[in-house]
Regions:
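Conserved C-terminal helix/tail region of periplasmic/extracytoplasmic solute-binding proteins
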Residues: 31-34, 38, 66-67, 166, ...
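Short, well-ordered beta-strand elements
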Residues: 35-46, 65-70, 93-94, 194, ...
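Short, polar/charged alpha-helical segment
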Residues: 28-30, 46-66, 401, 419
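Hinge/lid segment of periplasmic solute-binding proteins
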Residues: 27-33, 100-155, 208, 291-295, ...
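Extracytoplasmic/periplasmic solute-binding protein
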Residues: 139-151, 156, 180-226, 269
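C-terminal lobe and pocket-closing loops
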Residues: 33, 277-289, 300-400
């Protein structure tokens, strides 16, 4: 296992909210205290939740709690959550959340239950809260309150067909600006395959596009204003949109992780820039095990600044079963469960899972797994959680970013016009903060 990844995970000091947890672990802990209770988990139908839900029966046997799982695609999950929360409904007890996206917004709306008291007073002896990545705990802390527990760490990585690269006599470029030339050579060499695919769906694409922006030296805001029309911003929009327009699949404006992974897994794409979470999905069935390589996106004029975030599991502030819900969070994020999920390709937020000999042996079984771990190591050391604008209205900001990229991708507007319109709308959002 890569020592740098471990160092990043353990090397940062923890917030004081974690320091209280060892006192609580000495107390008697009863997993059956809320037996007979029924809780509802609103889940994103992604690899993290899918891997976790496979073990649902283990949680129910341990606690006697009935777990109802409502799983949706990410956009539909959030629509369901917003409807429930706006109605102050108690129908959702636990939900998945991305602090980098909605943390500030949901916290200010009062939708998260504060988990700080639970972490201080209601943890099992073997929970070990200090085992979590400090950076992920920091991301899940808003105004001094813990809004969720980390489930994973992830970021976009480049999956690519080593066998096709060898056949076509190409290699990954050292500079991001040379990606179109690579895609063009692949298109000429293998005209029946899609050279490059990544996210085109408006609310989803900032996750992958942000790496292009940051690697080319751009940022979303400068001096309190939107900076999408900076020279680096314009260049990054042109590059990202151009790759998908000229070398992506038909209908790519509707692509998110599901369509991308399906296309690559089926052997119809040579390169796929998508979440590290998708490793297990892509490798499922074994067709890609022998021909896939994994790497971070090439650096650009601004260096290498990959996206690095993590999903959390949160308790609804309107739940009538917060104590039972906390048991589910604790079980899902426990050292034992995280070690199991790591063996299914879910990068763990706990150092104990990273150090586990079983995980090391699992990674060593395939070259792609070793490369995946190396890529996560680099994401950990150099990554940023800035996906969209660092404002309460982050989710809305992503729509405007996506619209600007889509306009260029579809040929509706040149990059300069698309980003100018986006900057105007984004500055209006910023002014409301």
């Amino acid at each position: 296992m890569h020592s740098a990844l471990r160092a990043v995970v353990v090397g940062i000091s923890f917030a004081t909210l974690l320091s209280a947890s060892p006192r609580a672990t000495a107390q008697a802990f009863d997993w059956h205290k809320y037996a007979g209770t029924r809780i509802t988990f609103l889940a994103n139908n992604n690899p993290v939740a899918n891997a976790l839900v496979k073990h649902k029966d283990e949680f129910e046997k341990l606690t006697g709690i009935e777990l109802k799982v409502d799983a949706y695609q990410e956009q539909q999950m959030r629509q369901r959550l917003v409807t429930s929360m706006n109605a102050r409904s108690s129908e959702v007890d636990v939900f998945m959340s991305l602090p980098s996206r909605e943390g500030l917004q949901f916290a200010r709306a009062g939708w998260y239950a504060d988990l700080t008291p639970y972490l201080a007073n209601a943890v099992a002896p073997d929970y070990d809260a200090k085992d979590f990545s400090p950076g992920l705990v920091k991301d899940a802390t808003v105004d001094g309150k813990l809004i969720g527990v980390p489930l994973n760490l992830e970021g976009p990585v480049l999956y690519y067909r080593g066998d096709i690269f060898k056949k076509c006599g190409v290699a990954l470029p050292a500079d991001l600006k040379d990606m179109p030339a690579l895609a063009d050579r692949l298109k000429k060499c293998e005209p029946d395959l899609t050279p490059f695919v990544s996210r085109g769906q408006k609310p989803a694409l900032p996750f992958t596009y942000s790496v292009f922006l940051h690697n080319m030296g751009g940022s979303y805001m400068q001096d309190g204003k939107s900076a999408l029309c900076s020279p680096a911003g314009v260049a990054s929009i042109r590059l990202y949109a151009g790759l998908l327009k000229d070398y992506g699949p038909p209908g790519v404006v509707n692509y998110s992780f599901y369509q991308i992974s399906s296309l690559y897994k089926a052997g119809r794409a040579v390169m796929a820039f998508e979440s590290s979470n998708e490793l297990s999905t892509i490798m499922q069935g074994g067709a890609r095990e022998g021909d896939t390589n994994v790497a971070v996106l090439p650096a650009g004029a601004g260096g290498s600044h990959p996206t690095m975030i993590g999903w959390t599991m949160a308790v609804s502030n309107y739940s009538r079963h917060k104590d039972a819900a906390w048991l589910f969070l604790q079980w899902a994020s426990s050292p034992a469960m995280q070690k199991k999920l790591a063996l299914e390709g879910i990068a763990p937020p706990r150092v104990s899972a990273l150090r586990d000999p079983a995980f090391t042996a699992w990674a060593d079984q395939q070259p792609a797994r070793r490369q995946w771990v190396a890529a996560l190591d680099q994401l950990s050391r150099t990554g940023t959680a800035e996906v969209g604008y660092p404002i309460v209205a982050n989710p809305a900001s992503r729509e405007f970013i996506g619209q600007a990229v889509n306009d260029v991708m579809l040929g509706s507007r040149p990059a300069e016009q698309a980003c100018t319109q986006a900057d105007q709308s984004l500055n209006d959002l910023i002014a409301k903060e």
